[in-house]
């Protein structure tokens, strides 16, 4: 799998057939679709649309998407994690010790969810949000408090 390095502001979308490593903060006007993993190398990543990774998404700063954030494995940020739509991870979701996690719709992780402050799910303002759409589903809420949404801990630890 090839590795691509990016930074700066991109008009349109960013599609990567491999891994993405940031060499500075990255802002993408539309969406980000990466077949491999996204390593922000201490920088922040922001998309006007969705952010999707086949592997992990790791940022030393914040992760922000106007639409959804989805990773085949983990989503980890040194700062906040914010999505206008849903947040989904095949592994864990972790925001920084002085930050929170916010989603317009649901938050789902096969493993743990953790942050230093608060978790908000289902705060979308564009229509009535159902209980299913404001659910935080994870094996365990490891750290942080649910400020808005319904917590559903599965207790299942992936092997």
Explain the meaning of each model-derived region:
Residues 1-33, 37-47, 62, 68, ...:
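Intrinsically disordered, low-complexity terminal regions
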